[in-house]
């Protein structure tokens, strides 16, 4: 017995998520252009998508960070410390570049609403006071109220505590993390429909001005990533190896960044990076640890995304930011970026944590996340390419520096 073919279902299963998002974006634009009244009604789909993101984000941050810390292995004898330092310096430098670019070229977003009961911080002292109170919040209340700083604090604390637990307990945490990540992936699969509703309603209400705002935001994001890839990272590598870094930089971008751009997953690109390290003749005991570690914590692209989108929301809402607070944002964005690995849309879902520094409500922060999904077609690909290629770049730089030091001894 033969069953009739279902070309629509076949097309959906064969088309990538990026392709589906592009279709949803174009369909939303067309609907808003020709049937604005209908476009306003389908905005409900976008609201459902944003609500789903709001529901999953707190649990995601809590479980992911706790499981990651609990399952960290101790006692590995490798030259990992210099590479770890490069990862942290690179991520923080990327956040600083994003802060400078956001001040030099401020972006404005078209948000559905500007809540009137906002209480933006007056300066660094007030921010630190609010930060401390958020850290010591009740964990249940932190999850319910989406207090991401409190969630992060409890996740780190419990993760450290569970490092001394039995293997069974740590495996359970790892499986729990995988389960939550699967739920996130299911939510992200509905991104094309959510983007369709968001784009249709946004452009029906705001017209071409919203598109201009997104274009400017995308230019700032990609400009920061290109600057980090071709200026900041080569400078860091030069200080480490004391020779022309660009042959190595271009090799990593070509061999690792190209595949990462299309897979949009640092975890999926780990085999590619391991093979590239082998071809470069690097120390196997080092890169076998540093590459998976880099896929977890080396997140310069994510730091840029979190910083630029957060400051875009701050600029849109008219919140004044002083220099110390901007520096604190760079630190927070770097820490947030380390928790964005291996998760679909991870860097976008951590934006509310950074937004909370400025008293921005979760409702507004998740609208910013939705904007991020609209531009994610290019943003996420470029972010992953920067993150993954830098894993090999910094590993190669550290290995070469160690070899030079050993030969000089």
From Swiss-Prot:
Q: Which residue ranges traverse the bilayer? A: 17-37, 49-69, 83-103, 142-162, 180-200, 218-238, 301-321, 331-351, 357-377
- Write out the GO cellular component annotations: plasma membrane
State the UniProt keywords alphabetically. Amino-acid transport, Cell inner membrane, Cell membrane, Membrane, Symport, Transmembrane, Transmembrane helix, Transport
Give the InterPro entries listed for this entry: Na-dicarboxylate_symporter, Na:dicarbo_symporter_sf, Ser_Thr_transp_SstT
Q: Does the keyword Ribonucleoprotein apply?
A: no
* Primary localization: membrane
What GO terms describe the biological role, i.e. biological process, of this protein?
serine transport; threonine transport
Membrane association type: Multi-pass membrane protein
Q: Is Membrane there in the keyword field?
A: yes
Classification via SUPFAM superfamilies: Proton glutamate symport protein
**Record's catalysed reaction(s):** L-serine(in) + Na(+)(in) = L-serine(out) + Na(+)(out); L-threonine(in) + Na(+)(in) = L-threonine(out) + Na(+)(out)
The GO molecular function terms of this record are: neutral L-amino acid:sodium symporter activity
Q: Which Pfam families match?
A: SDF (PF00375)
Q: Where in the cell is it found?
A: Cell inner membrane
| Protein family membership | Belongs to the dicarboxylate/amino acid:cation symporter (DAACS) (TC 2.A.23) family.
Q: What does this protein do?
A: Involved in the import of serine and threonine into the cell, with the concomitant import of sodium (symport system).
Which NCBIfam families does the protein's record reference?
PRK13628.1
State the name under which the record lists this protein.
Answer: Serine/threonine transporter SstT
Identify the species of origin: Pseudomonas aeruginosa (strain LESB58)
| Taxonomic lineage | Bacteria, Pseudomonadati, Pseudomonadota, Gammaproteobacteria, Pseudomonadales
């Amino acid at each position: 017995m033969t069953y009739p073919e279902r070309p629509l279902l076949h097309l959906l299963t064969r088309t990538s998520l990026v392709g589906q998002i592009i279709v949803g974006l174009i369909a939303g634009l067309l609907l808003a252009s020709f049937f604005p009244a209908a476009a306003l009604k389908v905005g409900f789909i976008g609201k459902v998508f944003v609500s789903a993101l709001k529901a999953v984000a707190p649990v995601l941050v809590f479980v992911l960070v706790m499981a990651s810390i609990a399952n960290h292995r101790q006692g590995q004898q490798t030259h990992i410390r210099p590479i770890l330092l490069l990862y942290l310096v690179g991520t923080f430098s990327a956040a600083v570049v994003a802060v400078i670019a956001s001040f030099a070229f401020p972006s404005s977003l078209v948000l559905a609403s500007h809540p009137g009961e906002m209480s933006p911080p007056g300066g660094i002292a007030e921010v630190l006071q609010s930060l401390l109170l958020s850290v010591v919040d009740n964990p249940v209340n932190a999850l319910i109220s989406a207090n991401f700083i409190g969630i992060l604090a409890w996740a780190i604390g419990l993760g450290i505590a569970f490092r001394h637990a039995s293997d069974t307990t740590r495996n359970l945490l790892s499986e729990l993390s995988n389960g939550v990540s699967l739920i996130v992936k299911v939510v992200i699969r509905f991104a094309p429909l959510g983007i369709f509703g968001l784009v249709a309603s946004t452009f029906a209400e705001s017209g071409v001005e919203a598109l201009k705002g997104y274009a400017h935001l995308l230019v700032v994001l990609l400009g920061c990533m290109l600057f980090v890839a071709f200026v900041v990272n080569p400078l860091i590598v030069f200080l480490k190896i004391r020779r022309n870094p660009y042959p190595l930089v271009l090799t990593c971008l070509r061999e690792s960044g190209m595949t990462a751009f299309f897979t949009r997953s640092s975890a999926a690109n780990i085999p590619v990076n391991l093979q590239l390290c082998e071809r470069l003749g690097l120390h196997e005991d080092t890169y076998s640890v540093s590459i998976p570690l880099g896929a977890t914590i080396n997140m310069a692209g994510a730091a840029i995304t979190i910083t630029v989108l957060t400051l875009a929301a701050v600029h849109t809402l008219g919140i004044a930011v002083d220099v110390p607070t901007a520096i604190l944002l760079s630190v927070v964005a770097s820490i947030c970026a380390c928790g964005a690995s291996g998760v679909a849309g991870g860097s976008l879902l951590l934006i509310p944590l950074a937004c909370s520094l400025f008293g921005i409500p979760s409702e507004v922060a998740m609208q910013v996340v939705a904007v991020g999904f609209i531009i994610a077609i290019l943003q996420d690909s470029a972010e992953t390419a920067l993150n993954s290629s830098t894993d090999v770049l910094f590993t190669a730089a550290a290995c070469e520096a160690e070899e030079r030091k050993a030969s000089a001894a």
